[in-house]
């Protein structure tokens, strides 16, 4: 038997994990084992909302060392994280300034300024990326305007996964799928757009040319002295999650469900027409030259904040209580930018209901019901938008990531969208990370080959739409006429 041992470092906005994958070549089986899981979150530092990258690096190294201590020979390592955020380095590789998080308010007003000065359509034609106020384009402008004293010291700007790869290997890389989330990569050249970079105030010398997934960045030397390849995987966590989505045919859509919900489809060509611009559709880079045509939805961030504020620890009990409540009594638009990072999420949700003359969700279960129903309805809106954009309906929706464990939300999604939902795999970002490593090690041919492995080894659950459900009736009778506000457009 031939085995490969690959390690995936998967960092999300609320948690991180170091996972060991064991691939058996002869039977094409893949098993995952969690080695180390740790918390991640936002911090306040010198007036900014930041990430504790030192703590994250320590947790990554701890997880890697645990694998080595077990005597396991690691064949490769890959790192994926969230998008848009970056770390600045000087000529000696030391950090400059703070690793500011995308939920910081420093970019307020800059997206509108860019649209006024450069033209909204021109920015979109160049980048193909949706307008979000925290895109790297606006973060860099905020940096150069508000902290000009840092500029002379900056030699390099590394996106989060590239920074952690650099810390392990000493080698710098700018991975393509994550680079596209910045709104700074030209969609035609796959290189940094000079006009957009110039507006941001950043120096092009801070960046190297983006590289597509599948190359070896460098090597991490483990405590035992072995040199282990660190692979540039599809380092944007959604790009990795899509790789592990067992999409079957052109009529399959995906929903990567976590802190954010990313709903979309794969395409060989981008969509940058006026319809796509009006819908704020993004064309993020994927593996093998594919595009992830998708839309950002605020996702389970709202629930995470409610759980935190109400100090709720038993999520299954909350979901059970939520399921017993009637549907669609409290409806908000999760994509309203008032929910990006409010001081108190519960109060913000209640205020949104009050302002629209609805009942006010008071209990924990009512707040959760409001979030789940509102998300499912927004999923239906976005799926319809995506189908109209490409001129063809979808036959199934694959929900992947941690959020796919929420069976109530899965069923609500199936009912609201009127589509068959296949939930799983849960650890989609980790699996997609592993998939690129296995391709780099010449164990698998391509993404479609890897998806066959996922289909046969992952635990998948199907949810059939119920046209007689409360939310299905709501969609048919009321929801189809409502107007929704674009997220940050």
UniProtKB/Swiss-Prot annotation:
The keyword Transferase applies. Its EC number is 2.7.1.5. Substrate binds at residues 83, 236-238, 296. GO terms for molecular function: ATP binding; glycerol kinase activity; rhamnulokinase activity. PANTHER family: L-RHAMNULOKINASE, SUGAR KINASE. Belongs to the rhamnulokinase family. This is Rhamnulokinase.
């Amino acid at each position: 038997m031939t085995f490969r041992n690959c390690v995936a470092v998967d960092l999300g906005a609320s948690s991180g994990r170091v996972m060991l994958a064991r691939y058996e070549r002869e039977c094409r089986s893949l098993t995952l084992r969690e080695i180390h899981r740790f918390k991640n979150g936002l911090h306040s530092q010198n007036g900014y909302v930041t990430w504790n990258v030192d703590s994250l690096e320590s947790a990554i190294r701890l997880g890697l060392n645990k694998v080595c201590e077990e005597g396991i020979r690691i064949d490769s390592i890959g790192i994926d994280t969230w998008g848009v955020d970056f770390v600045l380095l000087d000529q000696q590789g030391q950090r400059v300034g703070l690793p500011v998080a995308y939920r910081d308010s420093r970019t307020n007003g800059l997206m509108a300024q860019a649209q006024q000065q450069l033209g909204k359509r021109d920015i979109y034609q160049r980048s193909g990326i949706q307008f979000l106020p925290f895109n790297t384009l606006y973060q860099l402008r905020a940096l150069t305007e508000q902290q000009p004293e840092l500029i002379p010291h900056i030699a390099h700007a590394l996106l989060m996964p590239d920074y952690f790869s650099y810390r392990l290997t000493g080698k710098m890389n700018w991975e393509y799928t994550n680079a596209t989330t910045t709104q700074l990569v030209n969609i035609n050249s796959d290189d940094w757009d000079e006009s957009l970079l110039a507006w941001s105030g950043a120096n092009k010398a801070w960046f190297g040319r983006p590289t597509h997934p599948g190359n070896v960045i460098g090597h991490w030397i483990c405590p035992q002295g072995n040199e282990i390849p660190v692979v540039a995987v599809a380092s944007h966590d959604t790009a990795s999650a899509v790789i592990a989505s067992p999409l079957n045919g052109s009529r399959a859509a995906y929903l990567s469900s976590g802190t954010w919900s990313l709903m979309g489809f794969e395409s060989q060509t981008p969509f940058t027409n006026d319809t796509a611009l009006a819908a704020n559709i993004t064309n993020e880079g994927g593996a093998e030259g594919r595009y992830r045509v998708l839309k950002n939805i605020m996702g389970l961030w709202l629930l995470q904040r409610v759980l935190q504020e109400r100090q709720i620890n038993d999520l299954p009990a909350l979901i059970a209580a939520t399921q017993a409540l009637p549907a669609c009594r409290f409806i908000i638009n999760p994509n309203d930018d008032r929910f990006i990072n409010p001081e108190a999420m519960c109060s913000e949700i209640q205020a949104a209901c009050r302002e629209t003359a609805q009942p006010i969700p008071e209990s924990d279960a009512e707040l959760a019901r409001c979030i789940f129903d509102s998300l499912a309805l927004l999923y239906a809106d976005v799926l319809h938008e995506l189908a109209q954009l490409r001129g063809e309906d979808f036959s199934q929706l694959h929900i992947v990531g941690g959020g796919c464990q929420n069976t109530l939300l899965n069923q609500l999604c199936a009912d609201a969208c009127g589509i068959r939902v296949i939930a799983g795999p849960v650890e989609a970002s980790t699996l997609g990370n592993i998939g690129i490593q296995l391709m780099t090690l010449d164990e698998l041919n391509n993404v479609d080959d890897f998806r066959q492995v996922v289909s046969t080894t992952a635990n998948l659950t199907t949810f059939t739409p119920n046209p007689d459900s409360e939310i299905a009736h709501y969609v048919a009778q009321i929801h189809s006429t409502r107007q929704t506000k674009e997220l940050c457009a």
